[in-house]
UniProtKB/Swiss-Prot annotation:
This is Large ribosomal subunit protein uL30. It comes from Staphylococcus carnosus (strain TM300). The gene is rpmD. One of its GO terms (molecular function) is structural constituent of ribosome. The keyword Disulfide bond does not apply. Part of the 50S ribosomal subunit.
Length: 62
């Protein structure tokens, strides 16, 4: 299964609480922090909710 590298590129300051919680649930803490997640429906939904704050790259599943 493919994996996604998600990077927080914009700050959550001034964003609604739901977006802050979604970023936290993805495992992102500070700007420019990255996590590698499984490519599944749940993660895709969270990424879509905060797509204006993050960048997503597909990485090889090793």
């Amino acid at each position: 299964m493919a994996k996604l590298q998600v990077t927080l590129t914009r700050s959550v300051i001034g964003r609604p609480e739901t977006q802050r919680k979604t970023v936290e649930a993805l495992g992102l803490k500070k700007t420019n922090s990255s996590v590698v997640l499984e490519d599944n429906v749940a993660n895709r939904g969270q990424i879509n909710k905060v797509s204006h704050l993050v960048t997503v790259e597909e990485v090889d599943a090793k």
